[in-house]
């Protein structure tokens, strides 16, 4: 079944907030094998001008799992069959580093749904903001729904 094109342009309101902790950042840095001291040592981060440890840029992917319940892909009316979905790509535009102590929330928008051969490509844009409204990052994620494009008459 094709993905519901009526979702293109649909906005999803701010999610519940998530407080970023030092341990969240440290665990992620260890998991990806990045030894940057600014990710684990507050003194090293402060020496670089940050208020606390900072997160690796790709840390924001973990927030997608926390914010996911408010996302378009959780909406049954979208018609997305998770058993057919693979991750396409992820892009990050960081407006400032994510720091321990940040309280973040996100809004999402379905930017595009289109056929690519027998598959469908869905692009979602997420705006991540701090509690004070400061824009932290803009992410763009694409997912591929395999074999669900509308069949074309030959």
Spans of features found by a protein language model:
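Hot-dog-fold acyl-thioester-processing enzymes
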Residues: 1-87, 150-154
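Short alpha-helix capping/helix-loop boundary micro-motifs
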Residues: 89-93
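HotDog/MaoC-like acyl-thioester-processing domains
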Residues: 1-6, 94-154
